[in-house]
Amino acid sequence: MSNKKNDRRTQILQALAQMLESSPGARITTAALAKQVGVSEAALYRHFPSKAKMFEGLIEFIEESLFTRINRIVQEESNVIARIEMIVTLVLGFAEQNPGMCRLLTADALAGETERLRVRITQVFDRIETQLKQVIREADLKQGLRPAMGVAPCANFLIAIIEGKIRHYVRSEFKVKPMEIWPEQWTVLAQNLMLNR
């Protein structure tokens, strides 16, 4: 019984993510979601007490997907510049592979929803920025490199790039992919991001 319930929850979340992708700018209603899943609205509410909880389920998926991999990068990669590249590339790649989630990451799909959801999205980016700050600080300790503009401004600059590329992806209705010209951009950025002591 529990597996069937989890399968239905997963099916609901996948349908919600697909609707976010296929209907840029549109508000998702529980009636439309129920129709997409092929169940009644009451059936949706048996699995999630509110639409906000459905969005939270997607945000939890984003957090788990990103932070599990970010932690692995930090543990396994010793080169700081490579770590930074891998973290930024991970987030951009995740965004490109999950266009519907980008509407959550930009809070585009959260207009009119509870403030708690926007706070959760802000926290996702804050956590990524904190992780980048930690990696940048380690550059000095482990490799004798210092950021060209200070730790906090450097991490903030990287987050601005991530958010800007995701927002551009949403604004283009998923035509301009975040990874499309990222390798060339990273080459220029990496040359100017850190300085030798």
Curated annotation (Swiss-Prot):
Gene3D superfamilies membership: Tetracycline Repressor, domain 2
GO biological process, alphabetically ordered: cell division; negative regulation of division septum assembly
Single GO molecular function: sequence-specific DNA binding
CC per GO annotation: bacterial nucleoid; cytoplasm
Similarity-based family: Belongs to the nucleoid occlusion factor SlmA family.
NCBIfam families: PRK09480.1
Protein name in the entry: Nucleoid occlusion factor SlmA
Source organism of this protein record: Marinomonas sp. (strain MWYL1)
Primary gene name: slmA
